[in-house]
């Protein structure tokens, strides 16, 4: 995937009341999206190894930006990712050179997310971008993850994230809005103090 002009896009959308910001406000600054796959599903979807996914979006306490914490679990230890998201109106799924980030993703309006390789903003290495379809007014989302996901294999974020390959069957995940309790681990145990407000 290409590199999204994320900082500019985030700045442009931060001043407007986007559907993402409106939904976050209605949820008290927190939105949890979750999905689990049982053995029957996996047996009918050959190649898929992801069994569970959680996306937690919270409003930064100081900047007001939508911050992202995610968990993708399948074979081996889960992958935990950290970044931020922004609403895009008409230019979703476009990189810095106006290139298409993911050819399988068709909507042009929705949520664009950017992952980091650390939780304090000091790393110069980018963590990757991916588009997210906003479904039924935020009652569900469909994430088109990159083929290499920046993240940690534990809750320890003292070192920079590594890149973990995702197969084609694991990259598109549809999650439903869930009670905040389903993302409690991400909220309370995964980089709980991180804000990225100085980036």
Question: Model-found features: residue ranges?
Answer:
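Glycine-rich, aromatic-bearing surface loops/beta-hairpins
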Residues: 122-199
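Disulfide-stabilized extracellular ectodomain repeats and their linkers
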Residues: 29-30, 82, 110, 180
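Bacterial N-terminal signal peptides
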Residues: 1-9
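Contiguous, well-ordered beta-strand patches that form the walls/edges
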Residues: 65-145
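N-terminal glycine/threonine-rich, aromatic-flanked beta-hairpin/loop signature
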Residues: 44-90, 146-152, 164-171, 182, ...
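N-terminal helix-cap/turn-to-beta initiation motif at the start of protein domains
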Residues: 15-32
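Short, solvent-exposed loop/hinge segments that bridge or flank secondary-structure elements
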Residues: 27-65, 126-135, 177, 196
